Amino acid sequence: MKKVIILGSTGSIGTQTLDVIKNFRENFEIVGLTAYNNVELLSKQIREFNPKVVAVKDEDKANQLRENLKKNVEILTGSKGLQEIVKYDADLVVVAVEGIAGLIPTVTAIQRGKDIALANKEVLVTAGQIVMDLVKKKDITLLPVDSEHSAILQCLRGNDKKEVSRLILTASGGPFRGKKKEDLRKVTVNEALNHPNWKMGKKITIDSATLMNKGFEVIEAKWLFDISEDKIDVIVHPQSIIHSMVEYIDGSVIAQLAAADMRIPIQYALNYPTRNYINGINFLDFSLTTQLTFEKPDLETFRCLSLAYEALKIGGTMTTVLNAADEIAVSLFLNKKIEFLQIAEIIEESMKEHNNIQNPTLDDIINVDKEVKEKIAKKYMR
């Protein structure tokens, strides 16, 4: 039986991970769960899955949780709670918590020799070199939960990495595919949150609308698969049936196809290297799939993707700046403090102003993240 800790169990990926685990209760034991502030849902999860330990953001939430529960479960709090919970006996840590808050717990879990199922983008976007060096040193397995990276992993299995010509990440194009800059000047938050294919959290949905999500995935792919950025391409595929592809040096292309359901890559990460049937999964009916279309991304309109490639080429803390500026810019947009197109403008401005640090430490990364966010907030939250 595989012992599992889920960081961010009340979010989109966390709840779907537990939904998958319900299918294989005999194979998994939930050791720990964490939540930011959704105590009500966390209480339900505790009753259903009986973890030994949980963690929440602050003491008030912890007290609320104690009042809700009659079970004997240890409750940790704060950022230290996230770091402590991954020290408990477990085989796999699912990192589904959002933001830079996922970095230190992930590093701590790897240092403790635990395998990682990674759904947090910030970990590799900001500290890819540090994290993957540690993965090799500790000889653990780090598995991607993203549908695109899971697809690449599946397309690479059984093949020699030396024979890879390029990785091709597919993008749906988001809700504004085909629009030009002028069309996007007055888009609303609700319009940006209306993703055509995927049901996701608000932050990642906005990142999908700007194509920054795909930019982050390019950076992650570099570190996950140890490949240079000039061998990672992005293609817009509106149907979201092909989740990504690998092209080999003989011209062959291997693609992974599936319904747009995050439970499929979650299942693959949980059960790796085997596969299992999941109740309620839709199987593709190719007789109903009338066409698969592809187009180049519009880098002039959706500049965030270009900025991600630029940050990756520069290296060092520039990807941390990219991530931090995007995180707060998206928050400002969601709170109607800025317009949609200002997201890319704020990111570019932050990158231009940054004094880059090559080969940063974890402290450097955390400090740069904090400085960038504070600077943007001070300017736009007046």
Swiss-Prot record:
Positions with a binding annotation for Mn(2+): 146, 148, 217
Chain residues that bind NADPH: 10-13, 38, 120, 122, 201
Superkingdom in the source lineage: Bacteria
Cystine bridges: none
Gene Ontology process terms (BP): isopentenyl diphosphate biosynthetic process, methylerythritol 4-phosphate pathway involved in terpenoid biosynthetic process
UniProt keywords, alphabetically: Isoprene biosynthesis, Manganese, Metal-binding, NADP, Oxidoreductase
Claim: NADP is one of the keywords in the record: yes
Pathway field: Isoprenoid biosynthesis; isopentenyl diphosphate biosynthesis via DXP pathway; isopentenyl diphosphate from 1-deoxy-D-xylulose 5-phosphate: step 1/6
Protein family membership: Belongs to the DXR family.
Cross-referenced PANTHER family: 1-DEOXY-D-XYLULOSE 5-PHOSPHATE REDUCTOISOMERASE, 1-DEOXY-D-XYLULOSE 5-PHOSPHATE REDUCTOISOMERASE, CHLOROPLASTIC
Record-given protein name: 1-deoxy-D-xylulose 5-phosphate reductoisomerase
Taxonomic source organism: Thermoanaerobacter pseudethanolicus (strain ATCC 33223 / 39E)
Gene name for this UniProt entry: dxr
